[in-house]
């Protein structure tokens, strides 16, 4: 994080006007909350659970993919979708229990904001969950945009999601 802090000092306001961040694995370590939600979900459906460390390799490409990876081999798509739906609902209510802010992130965000740089965050989490997480971990950071899955905007990694944010 020291490297980023030093780089940040090199930018003046004319050079950098906005900074857009991903959430999971960038601003926050969410593996333990996501893994716990997945394990609760798997147990609810009678499937075996995984060590939380295993979820590091399951996360990425959205919740449906997480549950495809976590479910036993051969699990049908309808069941995977049911796992995703149950897990999403559970996670929405338990998304701030074990998540941790990465070292240096608050200082970086406050430093950028102090320089007048507009801050944004884009995630594939539902918009309601994204806003809840951001309000919990970064209540003092003036994010101009907190964009999650609202059912309308394209999801990451579609380049349109970033382009839409830039247009705002």
Residue ranges, per PLM feature:
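Structural motif
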Residues: 58, 122-124, 149
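N-terminal helical cap/lid subdomain that shapes the substrate entry/recognition surface
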Residues: 3-4, 12-107, 115, 128, ...
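Short active-site oxyanion
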Residues: 116-120
